[in-house]
Amino acid sequence: MNGFGVAAHARLRPDKVAIVHGDRRITYSELDDLVARAAVVLERYGIGPSSRLGVALRNRPEWFVGALGAARLGAACVPIPSGATTDEREYFCTDGEVGFLLDEAALPEFMRAVAAVDPVESPGPHRAPDYVALRAYTSGTTGRPKAVLRPETPVQQSIEGLVRYYVAYGLDSPDEINITGSPLHHLAGFSGPHSALLLGHTTVILDHFDADEWFGVVAAERATYAWCAPVHLYRLMSAADAVKAAADVSSIKRMLHGSAPCAPSLKREVMEFFPAGAVWETYGGTETMGTVITAEEWMQKPGSVGRAAPGSTIKIYDDDGGELPPGEVGLVYIGSDWGRGFRYAGDAELTESIYRGNLATLGDLGYLDDDGYLFVVDRRKDMVITGGANVYPAEVEAVLVTHPDVAEVAVIGLPDDEYGELVTAIVVPAGEGLTASELIAFAREHLVRYKAPRRVEFVTELPRDPMGKVRKRTLRAQFS
């Protein structure tokens, strides 16, 4: 997070609208004032250099007021789902060593304090040499989300990098308008608006993603670009014919999508609906970002996720660390010119295990063709990507197995037209009487909603290999 880009734009274009949220329009001058005041309040709350602010708010401007205020103090932002359960919040706050949690309950008092302070008191930048800007969480293979620490690159280097990306995307005007309906706690949700604010664009924040509302706001605000997961594209294309017929999307220059595989048939439908050349795809993860492919390129290389984005490098390695030639499948490694862009908190061994030099792997298998285009042939072995959000089965299994009527459980992802994959629990019951609805309700008491199973199947035993490991591939084939 960068709390000072807003200040620069407030000086250069004070009356430029920074954030639109419903009927609210906040200029850069107003946003800078709010962020400065928030920094004063947060400092009084004990937030300072190298400390951490947890943000568990719904989509609203105050999300950025708090996060950017913390950044001005040299503190890290810890995004937390606003719908997280008590158990999940406790984990995020304890593991993240959160000094103050800005959630919906704390927001009214916080904003009253912000309104009452003198922004002149706002502290200057106090950042440790190893300042960590963001402590985001990615689902962990051991059953608990893992903290990913993103250091703040020098401001000039950070902005130069963003400019390179956005020039490559064809979004090089200061008058660009971003629209987002993704949850701001998710990296894919806040990175678009945050980048927009760094570059002096306007960002339009929706409470949540609703296709009818999205079309209406795009037309009303003349939005020029959006970041979407395939589930959003599906919902847009599933809107009523009358809604789509009346939709004015002529202002859209780029529909950028990523975070999960997109069915070729859906992508072609989206490409036909939006202005020519508007649909571009990116590939990366919470940890890093690596490729981009234009609409024209994708038509020539269907199925590819693109070539290395400006400032990025892609290589394919075998299990022994040897670099593979074009056409050979291996582990995909990506990285940026800035060096290592992240590390796992408190786990140097895990961090080192995914790096080769400054390149990191997301655990995906793929190959480069002779022209340098990346094709991902398989994703992380067990991870479920549902609606663009990553869910690791181990975390869900750890909750479900605590139900007294569950003897064994395996969680897998099954194909779904809307969500991409459905979180599905394959259960060996401990007795009689357990129902799917009961188990789903139990899961939602302990997990944020998108992690809970949407489908439950009952079996008498789970298929296992000679070492006792569950054969999830067999289950996926059986229930798909």
Walk through the language-model features, giving the residues of each.
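Conserved ATP/PPi-binding loop(s) of AMP-dependent carboxylate-activating enzymes
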Residues: 311, 322-354, 389-391
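Gly/Ser/Thr-rich phosphate-binding loop
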Residues: 198, 224-228, 239-301, 313
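Conserved AMP-binding/adenylation subdomain of ANL enzymes
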Residues: 156-177, 185-224, 239
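Conserved adenylate-forming
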Residues: 42-47, 122-130, 135-179, 199
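ATP-dependent adenylate-forming carboxylate-activation enzymes
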Residues: 57-58, 78-91, 105-110, 201-221, ...
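AMP-binding/adenylate-forming catalytic core of the ANL superfamily
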Residues: 84, 226, 343, 353, ...
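Conserved AMP-binding/adenylate-forming core of the ANL superfamily
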Residues: 15-60, 85-90
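Structural core segment of the AMP-binding/adenylate-forming
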Residues: 40, 44-45, 49-52, 65-68, ...
